[in-house]
Amino acid sequence: MPESQQNRQTYLYMEQALQLARQTEEDVPVGAVIVHNGLVIATGVNERERNLDPAGHAEIVAMRKAAQVLKNWRLTGCQLYVTLEPCAMCAEAIIQSRVSTIVFGAYDPRSGACGSAYNLFIAGRPYPMPEVLGGIMEAECKELLKEFFRSRD
């Protein structure tokens, strides 16, 4: 796929993740999209408040759905698009599930595990590490989070 078309696809998938994030109600607005072979196979939003699930992060929700679609917990060849840098819990689940690529929007200096607060994607781990690309549509993703937290004050 030509680079310009790949870049266009990256922004389209991130826009879809952002639209999902906007649909969350009382949860922190984070949306995730999983793509396999050019097709969206799963989506997720934060569901911690709605389902009283401490592990109900958008990435985990989407990965669970993707595993069901693929009938395999190994998500090799999948790309994960998410509006906020994954936390340590999600990053480790991403590594364990063998996701091939992570694309995220806003950096999370408080708990981001793709390099902001921690970096779990380091060489020497016993699993293949995904390619990580951050800061895609960062301003839009950041603004959505700011609006959410301003409304909670």
Segments the model singles out, each with a brief description of its role:
Residues R48, V82, A106:
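Residues that line or immediately flank small-molecule/substrate-binding pockets and catalytic motifs
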Residues N72-L84:
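Immediate flanking context of iron-sulfur cluster ligation sites
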Residues E59-W73:
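Short, charged low-complexity linear segments at domain edges
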Residues R50-V61:
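A short, polar/charged loop-to-alpha-helix boundary motif
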Residues M1-D27, W73, M89-D153:
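Zinc-dependent deaminase
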Residues V30-G38:
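Short beta-strand scaffold segments in enzyme catalytic cores
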Residues I41-R48:
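Short beta->alpha transition motifs characteristic of CBS
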